[in-house]
Amino acid sequence: MSSRDSDCLHRFVFEHTDVRGELGHLDASWQAVLQRQTYPEPLRKLLGEAMAAAALLSATVKIKGSLHLQLQGDGPVSLVLVEVTARHTMRGLAQWNSEVPESGLREQVGQARLMLTIDPGEGGERYQGMVAVEQDLLQSTLEDYFAQSEQLATRLWLTANDQRACGMLLQQLPGQSDDDEDWNRDVFLGETVSDDELLELSVTDLLHRLYHEEDLRLFEPEPFSFRCACSVERIDTMLRGLGYDEVRDILEEQGKVSVTCEFCRQVYAYDAVDIERLFAASDQPEVPPTRH
């Protein structure tokens, strides 16, 4: 596979139809997630599929802020969370509390829901949609979401290994035609794709293999990269939100205040001088005196 395909999203349309598609391949951006946390194999695959899905979904909606894909349940896997920004930067994490089974999604997450949140940034209203997890595949659960929340015919194919996270999406645009013949044919051909083909074939080779008899137009690739949004400023704001007394209690109990970003594992450490400076610089009308 060429470097042109790596860490990129490729959009395509079937000419003279109401069907559009996307192919996404995450390499270095996916590796950056795995380098920061050791996950059991079944969870690595699920998180990789979620990363690929989030990249695909970010192209189906216009966002100025960020899109979050979240799985939350009471099973061995308690949380999967992926964030994609309007600048095509990504980060992701997962949390688990017991051995993660190899079997389907419902066994892994238990009673769970999938949520998609669009945060438009400053001044905008956040949108969130959700669907219960009733399928054994993440891609099928996302198809349920689109059928119920967006009322858009959507099909996805997702896969991941330790090197790549990949996905393909087909979507029928609303209101352009009452004839489903094109849609049904393109989905039927898409169903013949294998995980190995998604992982190994170049974009042009894969699209030719699937749709060489279709009139297809491929757009320029859109690059994606790993980038964490954590910063000293955000941690400062979080600590101020806890309040001076609680932060001082942590400091006295542990000797320092340490905050680890769950996405990138960056550690932010504060000593007594840092804490006093932090609260002295805040907008609080009164800063409690230093305890001795």
Regions found by a protein language model. Give the residues of each.
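Interaction interfaces in information-processing and related assembly proteins
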Residues: 2-220, 288-291
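Cys/His-clustered metal-coordination modules, chiefly Zn-binding fingers
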Residues: 189-292
